[in-house]
């Protein structure tokens, strides 16, 4: 059956729509993405060790602590004494302990693992955007061009250079949208793929992209349902959300318990309206770049506003946007996120939507609105690709040989501009090799009076052993918190019997009898057991659904086969 509307991201009719993207397209684009990612990030990959900015302060050590826990203790760390924001490492929004490839840390060094993730996620972003556009019906040349601009724009480069590995999750947005779109158009298995992609994002500690992509999906489902006058997009979105929550419950439940009242005070300003073109076009951008009109607060820098795409790419995208048709749902989403991301001058203060939202649940987790320009850029790229395809069919198709060569030349030129602009960022990330830290709680010996002391005897990621000495009964206070709402530690005394932990000033404290003995402390985050049970049950349900659907399709095909 021919496509009803070959260039519709959200077709008004949900039945009989052809989906031209093939497995060959996906495999070929991912292989190409791997090659281009290695070439593009060659300086970062082979020029030295990750060192600068947040790599050196904490993010490198998050990955390294996982490696140490796996290789030396053969477990995943639920507790990290020197983690930022919270020592509950399972609930830590930036913790990478449940990433889908974390087992590779058994055999790879920390730096090699992070760089491998960079290449794999970048290739996923390239392939996801390419495949999404091919599914819509966009020509190969245009899909390749737009995928290059998306996967290698300055947003990813800048955040990676300053030690924000969570940004890699943003590369999964095109694949997530593509899978959801396929599910709405009748590919049932695509819904579970979308749920898996969504869950992988949060399980790997990529918390900000997880929020952005779910906002994009929610708005897309709503607007698509309005356009199609059909509730199916919303029903499948709700099922996708439920499956995501179930698969990711092992992390999401502890996170919700930890950050239910999270409201960051370190807010940074949006992108000033006067600097929008600067962010997309200006050369010489690097971490310490400070153009007039922007002020850096709370440790922020230009990476909060770096969205370089270059003049060639921006010009082509603008032409595509001008010619696009039948893409208003995604265009509305892109415009809406753009309005959120910009800091509007006093004359346009009525457009300052962010001031209405920054105190609401979900929205208040965002440190600053400028990062919303990323989902806006994604939306504009998709809409522009449709417009460029229209231009091709209307005008460029007259030159069947010259047009593909011109498109390839523009793609290479745009990639060259992006690469040249990325080099200062890549170099800023490098430095001396970082070494593993001693993650033991400090001080190693507790107690000052000599009446009661506790000395750390054994240390593992989720288990501590203290040797206690008490001249008379008393209380010892340990250098970590009691817990949020309930005790996070199971404490056993010298005989193995459980001891009652109490809170003293928010710290964990234990009442000791006179004498000497060992106290064993086992870390148990709130809702950990409920989380992994929920995730396991959801996974079984998803697998069972896929198996049953496969059998039903097989029976249906057998009935249709000629005798």
Residue ranges and their predicted role:
Residues 309-339, 543-549:
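Hydrophobic, aromatic-rich transmembrane alpha-helices
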Residues 241-245, 382, 389-419, 562-563:
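Signature aromatic-anchored transmembrane alpha helix within multi-pass, membrane-resident enzymes
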Residues 1-44, 236, 405-409, 540-563:
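Start-transfer (signal-anchor) and selected internal transmembrane alpha helices
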């Amino acid at each position: 059956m021919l496509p009803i509307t070959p260039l519709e991201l959200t077709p008004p009719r949900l039945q009989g729509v052809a989906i031209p993207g093939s497995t060959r397209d996906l495999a070929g684009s991912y292989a190409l993405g791997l090659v281009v990612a290695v070439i593009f990030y060659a300086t970062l990959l082979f020029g030295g060790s990750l060192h600068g900015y947040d790599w050196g302060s904490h993010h490198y050590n998050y990955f390294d602590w996982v490696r140490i826990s796996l290789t030396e203790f053969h477990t995943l760390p639920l507790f990290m004494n020197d983690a930022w924001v919270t020592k509950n490492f399972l609930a830590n929004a930036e913790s990478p302990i449940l990433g889908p490839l974390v087992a590779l840390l058994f055999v790879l060094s920390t730096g090699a693992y992070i760089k491998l993730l960079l290449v794999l996620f970048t290739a996923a972003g390239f392939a996801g955007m390419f495949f999404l556009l091919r599914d819509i019906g966009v020509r190969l040349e245009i899909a390749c061009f737009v995928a290059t601009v998306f996967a290698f724009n300055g947003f990813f480069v800048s955040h990676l250079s300053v030690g924000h590995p969570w940004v890699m999750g943003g590369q999964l947005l095109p694949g997530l949208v593509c899978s959801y779109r396929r599910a709405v158009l009748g590919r049932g298995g695509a819904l579970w793929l979308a749920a898996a992609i969504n869950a992988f994002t949060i399980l790997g500690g990529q918390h900000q992209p997880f929020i952005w992509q779910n906002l994009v999906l929610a708005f897309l489902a709503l607007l698509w349902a309005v356009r199609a006058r059909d509730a199916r997009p919303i029903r499948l979105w709700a099922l996708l959300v439920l499956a995501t929550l179930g698969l990711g419950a092992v992390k999401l439940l502890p996170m919700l318990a930890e950050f239910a009242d999270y409201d960051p005070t370190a807010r940074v300003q949006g992108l000033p309206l006067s600097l929008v073109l600067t962010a997309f076009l200006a050369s010489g951008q690097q971490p310490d770049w400070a153009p007039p009109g922007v002020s850096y607060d709370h440790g922020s820098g230009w990476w909060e506003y770096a969205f370089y795409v270059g003049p060639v790419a921006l010009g082509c995208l603008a032409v595509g946007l001008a010619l696009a048709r039948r893409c208003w749902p995604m265009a509305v989403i892109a415009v809406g996120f753009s309005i959120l991301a910009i800091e509007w001058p006093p004359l346009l203060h009525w457009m300052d939507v962010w001031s209405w939202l920054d105190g609401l649940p979900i929205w208040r987790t965002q440190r600053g609105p400028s990062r919303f320009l990323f989902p806006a850029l994604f939306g504009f790229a998709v809409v522009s690709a449709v417009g460029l395809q229209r231009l091709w069919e209307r005008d460029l198709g007259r030159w069947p040989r010259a047009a593909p060569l011109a498109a390839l030349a523009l793609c290479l030129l745009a990639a060259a501009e992006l690469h040249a602009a990325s080099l200062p960022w890549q170099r800023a990330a490098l430095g001396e090799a970082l070494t593993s830290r001693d993650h033991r709680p400090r001080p190693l010996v507790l107690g000052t009076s000599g009446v009661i002391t506790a000395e750390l005897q054994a240390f593992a990621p989720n288990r501590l052993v203290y040797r206690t000495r008490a001249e008379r009964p008393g209380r010892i206070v340990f250098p970590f918190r009691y817990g949020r709402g309930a005790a996070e530690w199971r404490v056993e005394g010298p005989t193995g019997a459980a001891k009652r932990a109490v809170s003293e000033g928010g710290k964990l404290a234990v009442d000791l009898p006179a004498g000497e003995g060992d106290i064993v402390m086992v870390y148990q985050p709130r809702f950990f057991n409920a989380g992994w049970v929920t995730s396991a049950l959801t996974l079984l349900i998803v697998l069972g659904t896929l198996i049953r659907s496969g059998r039903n399709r097989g029976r249906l095909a057998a009935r249709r086969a000629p005798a």
